[in-house]
């Protein structure tokens, strides 16, 4: 918030986390210093996951009173991930002018392509190979739509997000088809 108060929100996997107001100009340099430590340790990219930000359930009302520099969270939540990705890229380039950053995010908004690679998010197969085929089929229109929506660099989790699948021959076939599809993605990566 503008009074530098942190809004805590329940983390989907337990506990709380803070929501950084990337719309506040002073936050950029603070975040740049924060992210520089892992860069100095050798990383060259960031996966800005859950930039919506994700809520563990929609019944939680904390977001209704969360005020950012540009307005109430429910009014600007679609641009939240974009502002995060913008700060990450600009701060990386400012502090590391001779290096190139890699970023990947699932929180898409107009202009995303200027800062980061798009990612379709976790596509879960659960514990069932038949669900995996459905998830693979879903990725094709999602990635094509992203490209038509001017986010040409979009990828998915090759093999989905599997649980404990014990039907190994069926999983091997699905895995092969995921890899074949992934070979035609702008970024091919196995999850």
Identify the function of each model-found stretch.
Residues 1-191:
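Catalytic-domain carbohydrate-binding cleft regions of carbohydrate-active enzymes
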């Amino acid at each position: 918030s503008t009074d530098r108060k942190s809004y805590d929100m329940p983390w989907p996997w337990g506990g709380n986390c803070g929501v950084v107001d990337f719309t506040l100009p002073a936050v950029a340099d603070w975040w740049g210093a924060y992210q520089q430590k892992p860069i100095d340790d050798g990383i060259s990219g960031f996966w800005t996951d859950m930039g919506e930000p994700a809520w563990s359930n929609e019944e939680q009302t904390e977001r209704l009173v969360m005020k950012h520099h540009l307005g109430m969270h429910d009014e600007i939540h679609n641009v939240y991930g974009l502002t995060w990705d913008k700060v990450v890229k600009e701060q990386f380039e400012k502090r590391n002018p001779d290096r190139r950053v890699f970023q990947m995010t699932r929180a898409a908004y107009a202009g995303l392509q200027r800062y980061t690679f798009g990612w379709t998010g976790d596509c879960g197969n659960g514990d069932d190979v038949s669900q995996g085929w459905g998830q693979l089929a879903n990725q094709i229109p999602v990635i094509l739509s992203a490209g038509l929506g001017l986010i040409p660099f979009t990828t998915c989790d090759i093999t989905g997000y599997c649980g404990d699948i014990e039907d190994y021959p069926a999983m091997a076939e699905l895995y092969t088809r995921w890899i074949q599809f992934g070979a035609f993605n702008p970024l091919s990566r196995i999850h």
